[in-house]
Amino acid sequence: MKWVTFISLLFLFSSAYSRGVFRREAHKSEIAHRFNDVGEEHFIGLVLITFSQYLQKCPYEEHAKLVKEVTDLAKACVADESAANCDKSLHDIFGDKICALPSLRDTYGDVADCCEKKEPERNECFLHHKDDKPDLPPFARPEADVLCKAFHDDEKAFFGHYLYEVARRHPYFYAPELLYYAQKYKAILTECCEAADKGACLTPKLDALEGKSLISAAQERLRCASIQKFGDRAYKAWALVRLSQRFPKADFTDISKIVTDLTKVHKECCHGDLLECADDRADLAKYMCEHQETISSHLKECCDKPILEKAHCIYGLHNDETPAGLPAVAEEFVEDKDVCKNYEEAKDLFLGKFLYEYSRRHPDYSVVLLLRLGKAYEATLKKCCATDDPHACYAKVLDEFQPLVDEPKNLVKQNCELYEQLGDYNFQNALLVRYTKKVPQVSTPTLVEISRSLGKVGSKCCKHPEAERLPCVEDYLSVVLNRLCVLHEKTPVSEKVTKCCSESLVDRRPCFSALGPDETYVPKEFNAETFTFHADICTLPETERKIKKQTALVELVKHKPHATNDQLKTVVGEFTALLDKCCSAEDKEACFAVEGPKLVESSKATLG
């Protein structure tokens, strides 16, 4: 993704643009400094998240012990910065605690080998061993009365367990945001545990909170993957576009400065430096509030809130109105006689300014689409500025963007029409079939997970007004496809997936969309056991029952990748009828024993 190097100078061209927010005096004790800055409550939470994200299998009690040891050290260092171990880096402090665990080798295997390395290589090694799909049971929410009793009995331990359980399942969860969600969780419990019907109060509120927190986790995973796989500049390019859309009245200098500082914040959190990340995030929010008159009047609604809510509020702000009377982009970037001169003298700055100007005028475009346009503009200038008549060569460059714009617009139109025709569940099934045919080598659980997530784009985005659909759809799909890429990178099985995931961050979605059925795939043998069901399926919650049916659908496609939609629809219909019949029978198991083999035979006959 070489094109994103054009952002480099943009964030380096003047130290004035990055002065102020993160310029701190050197501290004798880093841990004392961070403890003082973030406060004891947030310090304890961030240390717990740090250990939970590194050591995903350890019991909570073991983490609580480590957190106490680190907190006691921090307090000792606040009292006397010259005390023993107070001059250690935070990586040294956390890494030494991890490496001192007697059970490290037995529980984590190769992670123990990291302890033979010195910092910073040791921390990089720990990061490499974070598991995006840990072998942990699904998080089960207790009954309302049990939940409220645990909350009232020991509030501190209750929220410690919450941070621990979420962090170890999501090792890249944006730590300051996880503290925010814990705060929201507390507010819900405080209200609902006093209600007459606790369950009726808790369930919808906790469902909504869980949904938002899962999206937040996936968004941060994309940021971290972007930084880890494509470098800081890839994230800076993304942030430049998004902030230019959100704050179109802010000037280029302000946007550049915020981008630089925001990149530092996310790089720290992605690198496991959660105390620094939370501290710097608070400083950035403070800076933006101090300069709200030049950035956005919308900031006013956020800036009087406590720090966790303030930063969350700023992140969630809607786009400002585009300023009236902006000149056409073509004036500076096509018609100006010095386009090539400006480009060649300061390529990064000039192209960064182009992205800023184009993005602030197009809140109706997705971030990745705008980055594709930046890529196309750069390629045109690179070619044309080497010719005898550059202007004649690049005069139509903005018109040449149209196919790049039309492609995602058509994708959104077609898929939203399909969603409206099929509804949630059947739309997911259509995507299941589509993606199983594209990349049948991917494991069935991953295909089910990803296709269900892709299918949610319908309910999430298709009901939006036309102007909001494209950014909603494409930016959501970027997050979901990143999950596929992250899981596939650990256990690669498909060259097509590797290619789409590795070549270009902004072209991932078009790459996957362009994939046709894999004609090289050797179909799986028919396994009757895969399609054999028992009475226990009848007692499963509706969501889990749907997942069982979708798992069977993926296996059908892997067995018969050339099956028509009508054939698959027939088999799925027969399967649904079997469930309805046997789950209504008096002797459910006997029904499945008799009717199940009939389904297997009829399915084989239907599919040929």
From Swiss-Prot:
Ligand binding (Cu cation): 27
Keywords: Calcium, Cleavage on pair of basic residues, Copper, Disulfide bond, Lipid-binding, Metal-binding, Methylation, Phosphoprotein, Repeat, Secreted, Signal, Zinc
Modified residues (N6-methyllysine): 558
Tissue expression pattern: Plasma.
Signal peptide stretch: 1-18
Pfam family, one: Serum_albumin
Disulfide bonds: 77-86, 99-115, 114-125, 148-193, 192-201, 224-270, 269-277, 289-303, 302-313, 340-385, 384-393, 416-462, 461-472, 485-501, 500-511, 538-583, 582-591
Record localization: Secreted
Residues recorded with modification Phosphothreonine: 107, 444, 446, 570
Family, per entry: Belongs to the ALB/AFP/VDB family.
Protein name: Albumin
Gene source species: Oryctolagus cuniculus (Rabbit)
